[in-house]
Amino acid sequence: MSTASPPRLAALDLLRGFTVAAMIVVNNPGNWNSVYAPLSHSHWSGVTFADLIFPAFIFIMGVSLALARPRATTSTGWPRYQRIVTRAVTLIAMGLVLNAALAWPDLTAIRLPGVLQRIGITYLVTAIVVARTSAGQRWAIAGALLLVHWTLLVWPAHAFGAAALTPGANTAFWVDRAAFGRHMLTPSGDPEGLLGVLTSVSTALFGAAAGRWLAGGADASSRSTSPGRHLLMKLAAAGVVG
């Protein structure tokens, strides 16, 4: 006797479909010599429509993890985490294979970071955090990751000095150069570098909070008695603050 699948969340499917459609439009603008400005990534300062697509994917992943959590609790121990590790390793491997194909035949210049690698690492960390922590702990971890990321960007721990936030002269690119050497997208760093994992995991955890909220999983004892704080939590979960 088969168990009926839980109903799908239409809002999540709609956001996922819209994000995929937006990705296709951004990656295929029709004429690369004359691209509509919002469909181009910001060179450095500011943000464009194109810059929101990858975070949207990460947010959706967090929502999906929260919705899948009740079903995932049916398995415990290594089998539960084996699926997480397998999916993460598969994503990372796919990203490396694609990068190798682009670098072929000179594999000495292969790019190590990438979009799929970032998604794989983010999924691995977020899925384990969602599986092993409470909602309150996930809020704390998400906030702490943002604070750590901000601190690392402004801390004078490298040759550029404090608050060096120019292309090729900031902590994120300094870390990438130390970790990857020449195996990056550009000599000055990589947009899918190591420090960005912190903000990606934080975004996914905000997505998990949104998923829990949408599923109505918050019990009465965990809800704030302060209307203002409760509203702030809802806005953050919906991605307005986060």
Give the location of each predicted region:
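N-terminal signal-anchor module of multipass membrane proteins
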Residues: S2-R80
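Divalent metal-coordination and catalytic microenvironments
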Residues: R16, G62, G95, R118, ...
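Membrane-interface interhelical loops and short amphipathic "cap" helices
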Residues: P29-T48, A101-P113, A162-D190
